[in-house]
């Protein structure tokens, strides 16, 4: 168990280090997924502010989605974060997948955000 956590921590640190090197002052789209929900937020690291956030726990999302833990929900949340980001004046972001592989729900969220108008 401890070995798995070490590998996850190393992967997360490696991804963040690469992001900071390539960000050029752009905000980052950070993703967190649990077994039942998915969350994302757009963070401006220079100012230390969250510019926009969306999750499958929100009332509007819960009413329209069957569950918060599938690919359809992730795509819908991606579109929602893109709408909120454009309303906040953000169009270019850096995608921060954290320690998660770019597959399944994480990939669906990214594709939904791209469909919604975010560039990364």
UniProtKB/Swiss-Prot annotation:
InterPro entries: Ribosomal_uL18_bac-type, Ribosomal_uL18_bac/euk. One of its GO terms (molecular function) is structural constituent of ribosome. Disulfide bonds: none annotated. Pfam families: Ribosomal_L18p. The keyword Ribonucleoprotein applies. GO terms for biological process: translation. Keywords: Ribonucleoprotein, Ribosomal protein, RNA-binding, rRNA-binding. The keyword rRNA-binding applies. One of its GO terms (cellular component) is cytosolic large ribosomal subunit. Part of the 50S ribosomal subunit; part of the 5S rRNA/L5/L18/L25 subcomplex. Contacts the 5S and 23S rRNAs. This is one of the proteins that bind and probably mediate the attachment of the 5S RNA into the large ribosomal subunit, where it forms part of the central protuberance. Belongs to the universal ribosomal protein uL18 family. This is Large ribosomal subunit protein uL18.
């Amino acid at each position: 168990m401890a070995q798995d956590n070490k590998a996850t921590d190393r992967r997360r640190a490696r991804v963040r280090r690469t992001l900071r090197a390539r960000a050029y002052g752009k905000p980052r789209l950070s993703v967190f997924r649990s077994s039942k929900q998915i969350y994302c937020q757009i963070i401006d690291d220079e100012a230390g502010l969250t510019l926009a956030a969306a999750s499958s726990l929100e009332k509007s999302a819960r009413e329209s989605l069957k569950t918060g833990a599938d690919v359809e929900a992730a795509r819908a949340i991606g579109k929602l974060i893109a709408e909120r980001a454009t309303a906040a004046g953000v169009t270019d972001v850096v995608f921060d997948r954290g320690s998660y592989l770019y597959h399944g729900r994480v990939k669906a969220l990214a594709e939904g955000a791209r469909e919604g108008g975010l560039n990364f």
